Amino acid sequence: MKIVEVKHPLVKHKLGLMRENDISTKRFRELASEVGSLLTYEATADLATEKVTIDGWCGPVEVDQIKGKKITVVPILRAGLGMMEGVLENVPSARISVVGIYRDEETLEPVPYFQKLVSNIEERMALVVDPMLATGGSMIATIDLLKKAGCHSIKVLVLVAAPEGIAALEKAHPDIELYTASIDKGLNEQGYIMPGLGDAGDKIFGTK
């Protein structure tokens, strides 16, 4: 599995601001979107382009345009929605597919409860977005769902990842790519990433 920890100074600076304990909902939401945008920039660096001739202000001009697979952005509900706007700033024509996952309280296994995928997803590259990759359960379940629907070109974008989640994801789906702003130390006894960001969903939606 290709694993990319984006070390750009802007990414590190913005993520550092997100770690502040007393950060406002507005600021956290803005930064989640901004870092999501920067991760998208990195994740799409290998997109193929082709030469196209267009009508420029002074006549025909040859330009580069992206070719190949189109993109679908896949936010995992609910926290993934906080990164979606930033992703779409870079790929505004991308279609949106939505997946909802919850954890069964008895088995602790992830259970899909909602999915709305674009109709031609097998022809698209999926950018799956979720702020945190902790145990990896929700992400693995989402990718299982996407592959079952015929999508096999998949890149994962997360703000923070735990080594435990990375290992689980690599074991389940070694063919995908992971882009993260930080690989943190690991999980605590409650399953939170340390130092992490706390509950990203609560901070994005103001429900903490």
Swiss-Prot record:
One of its GO terms (biological process) is UMP salvage. Allosterically activated by GTP. The keyword DNA-binding does not apply. HAMAP family: Upp_B (MF_01218_B). One of its GO terms (molecular function) is uracil phosphoribosyltransferase activity. Belongs to the UPRTase family. The gene is upp. Its EC number is 2.4.2.9. Keywords: Allosteric enzyme, Glycosyltransferase, GTP-binding, Magnesium, Nucleotide-binding, Transferase. The lineage of its organism: Bacteria, Pseudomonadati, Pseudomonadota, Gammaproteobacteria, Enterobacterales. It comes from Pectobacterium carotovorum subsp. carotovorum (strain PC1). Its cofactor is Mg(2+). 5-phospho-alpha-D-ribose 1-diphosphate binds at R78, R103, D130, P131, M132, L133, A134, T135, G136, G137, S138, D199. This is Uracil phosphoribosyltransferase. It comes from the Bacteria. InterPro entries: PRibTrfase_dom, PRTase-like, Upp_B, UPRTase/APRTase, Ura_phspho_trans.
